[in-house]
Amino acid sequence: MYKEGVYFSDITRHHEDSGYKVKAISRLLFPILSLQKIPVDSYADVGCGSGGVTKAMKEQLKVSGFRTKKIEGFDISPHVAQLKEEAIVFKMADFTTEGELMDLFTLTNVLEHITEPVNFIAGIAHKAKIIAFHIPLDDCLNVHFRNLQRAKIKDPGHLIFLNTNSALNLITQSGLKILDYDYSFETLSAPSNNETNLQKIAFPVKLLISKISPCLLAKIFGFSLVVIAKNEILNDLGQAS
């Protein structure tokens, strides 16, 4: 589906949600970078898709005062050859085998498409100082009750179904240290979450539950999780130098 270019036959797929995802990531990421005085001279977006997150994060780094010299977007789908943006290099490549050491990585809505997520994260982790994840939580009552697993496997190609604990466990098992996590409140308003009449009717209910207990919302309707993690070895080496 991905390597053949079928998934991104429309190269703008999910582009409209990119800004919401970056806002959610930035809320956790930039206070950590500032507090720990972590420079971001290089940044890679793994599984860059339409390139929307890569572009939005480039702008966010700039307005936050980072002078990021090297920015790359990686995807195994051939559509990346059509993506163009000043100061960003888009590559059709598997980052786990071809990527270089980077200060910052983002993986937005990627893990659910991977059959061996621990090995995949570990393959990236040894090249990363900081990794920011945005992870859909599809292991919820809404999916179970409506028997949506089959449909999600077919499109959008979700191969595993995660909840809050299993997502955090995958990241820890990959050898990374979790610095912070929170639910992606910003993406409740994203276009893809407000397309159908049913979604529009459910929106105020979701919003109310999210204010009372985001964990409960994740268990009932599903949600997305933002996780910021670091490679302690690379960060220690950077501080020593």
Show where each model-derived region lies:
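Residues lining the SAM
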Residues: 108-111, 134
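Conserved N-terminal segment of class I S-adenosyl-L-methionine
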Residues: 1-102, 108, 118-123, 181-184, ...
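Di-metal (Zn2+ and/or Mg2+/Mn2+) metal-binding site signature of metallo-dependent hydrolases
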Residues: 113-116
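Conserved catalytic loop of SAM-dependent methyltransferase domains
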Residues: 179-206
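Short alpha-helix
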Residues: 159-175
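Short aromatic-enriched loop/helix-cap "lid" or pocket-rim segments at secondary-structure transitions
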Residues: 83-86, 142-147, 190-195
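Short, glycine-/aromatic-enriched active-site segment of Class I SAM-dependent methyltransferases
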Residues: 134-158
